[in-house]
A protein has these predicted regions:
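C-terminal capping/lid segments that line or modulate ligand- or cofactor-binding pockets
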Residues: 11, 49, 99-105, 109-119, ...
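Active-site acid/base region of carbohydrate-active enzymes
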Residues: 4-6, 10-22, 63-64, 81-83, ...
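Catalytic cores of carbohydrate-active enzymes
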Residues: 3-33, 46-48, 142-158, 198-278, ...
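Short, mixed-charge aromatic SLiMs
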Residues: 78-89, 136-140, 231-235, 285-296, ...
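Active-site flanking loop/helix segments enriched in acidic
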Residues: 38-43
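Glycine-rich, acidic and aromatic/proline-enriched surface loops and short helix-turn segments
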Residues: 21-32, 66, 75-82, 109, ...
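The feature captures the catalytic groove of carbohydrate-active enzymes
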Residues: 88-108, 139-224, 254-256, 261, ...
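Aromatic-rich carbohydrate-recognition surfaces in CAZymes
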Residues: 48-73, 78-166, 196, 316-333, ...
Length: 412
């Protein structure tokens, strides 16, 4: 029997109802056919499925369209290369699916893909494919992305971590297809909390899959392997005095830019609780850094490398994608109480106009309406963020076998 999915939401608050209804309608515009397969693209001018957004986006949308949610996982798994590398994006041109390997483009995949296993009814074949995909990708990372042998995985281009135009990358290339690092750059290959977290999240999910299979020996194996990655992050990238992680350049020098990537690491669950507590209390909630009028700029607003650029730029403005990832990041470490604060900020920033864009001014909360080649709307991470924050605050959400009820007051 085919699984049936649907979501219903009603509230007496006119703004919230309008936001949810509009997000529902505009999300449907991002449903596309890729070679006869229904997928949810990123939208807002981004016509592909990217590894940094669309497995996570597909999992969030699976409650409304399970077929698209599943395909947003499978197209990455089915197009994994023989050497274990997963495509950073998948395009469709003239009906043909084209996996692209010129960047990692983030990795919001393992936890989302595992959750889809539960949403689809626990298909063992899907679980086997996910296990194999993650095991092979983790092996690829450690075989290729520790080019100097210091035990810390590296990012080689801006798009590896999805940080378009980020100043902290210096003269690094935007993308990179080769299996050896670029030469002659000032910063890369860069020891990276993001890429290390790719490995941690893969290994943690492999441990969870092993538990589902009742393979306790493998579960302990992967838990120990994940702990090794977490330990290296703590000893090599974490600064106990500063209470934050910092990447290192090709000469192992600490790059002191205070970045939101610490929150990304929390999304991948690669911080210890103590590390997360320090970053949240010392930096995330600091109004001089990340807890601005519109919270979550990509770089702390008092950092020398912050730029309040209104077009796609990860050196500054608050990104809808960061809001989307922040939900899991905060839930992982018990900071659920911050989710309604962020949700309310996002609802008010989008407002009655219901234009869903990529970036927001951290000082005024004004949406940056122009991106790529013109005015932007229907940006998937903004649409799905509205739907997910509403579910967390006033509805229900599903995490593996558990149903959570939102009980925030104010919009009954």
């Amino acid at each position: 029997m085919k699984n049936q999915t649907s979501v219903s939401f009603q509230t007496s608050c006119g703004l919230l109802q309008k936001l949810v209804d509009t997000a529902e309608r505009k999300s449907r515009e991002n449903l596309k056919q890729f070679g006869g397969r229904l997928v949810l693209i990123e939208g807002g001018g981004y016509e592909k499925i990217w590894l940094e957004t669309q497995p996570m986006g597909g999992e969030m949308y699976a409650k409304r369209n399970l077929e698209a949610g599943i395909n947003n996982q499978l197209l990455f798994m089915e197009n994994q290369r023989a050497d274990g590398r997963i495509p950073g994006s998948v395009a469709c041109e003239d009906g043909k699916i084209i996996p692209q390997f010129n960047k990692f483009q983030g990795f919001c995949f393992p936890s989302a893909a595992l959750n889809v296993y539960y949403l689809m009814g626990k298909d063992p074949g899907y679980l086997d494919l996910l296990y194999t995909t993650l095991e092979r990708f983790d092996s690829y990372l450690w075989r290729v992305r520790d080019s100097d042998g210091d035990g810390c995985l590296e990012t080689w281009c801006k798009y590896d971590t999805g940080e378009d135009h980020a100043l902290r990358y210096g003269d690094a290339p935007d993308d990179w297809s080769k299996e050896t690092p670029p030469e002659g750059c000032s910063v890369v290959p860069m020891a990276s909390m993001d890429i290390m977290s790719f490995s941690y999240a893969s290994r943690e999910t492999l441990a969870k899959i092993s538990r589902i299979r009742n393979d306790m020996e493998k579960m302990e194996f992967w838990k120990e392997k994940a702990a090794q990655v977490q330990g290296k992050i703590r000893t090599y990238l974490w600064d106990e005095t500063a209470g934050a992680c910092f990447d290192r350049d090709k000469n192992h020098r600490v790059l002191r830019t205070m970045t939101h990537n610490n929150l990304r690491a929390m999304y991948w669950n690669s911080f210890t609780q103590q590390m997360a507590d320090r970053f949240v209390n010392d930096h995330l909630l600091n109004p001089e850094e990340f807890w601005t009028h519109m919270p979550l700029p990509s770089v702390a607003v008092n950092d020398p490398l912050f730029r309040n650029v209104t077009t796609n730029d990860w050196s500054g403005q608050a990104e809808a994608l960061t809001y989307q990832r922040a939900i899991r990041a905060l839930e992982n470490y018990g900071y659920d109480s911050l989710i309604p604060e962020l949700g309310e900020k996002l609802f008010q920033a989008i407002g009655e106009d219901c234009i869903f864009v990529q970036q927001y001014d951290p000082f005024t909360a004004a949406p940056s309406l122009v991106c790529l080649e013109g005015e932007q709307d229907c940006y998937g991470p903004a649409l799905l963020s509205v739907l997910e924050y509403a579910a967390r605050m006033y509805g229900v959400h599903l995490e593996q076998d558990t149903v959570f009820w939102g009980t925030v007051g104010g919009y009954e």
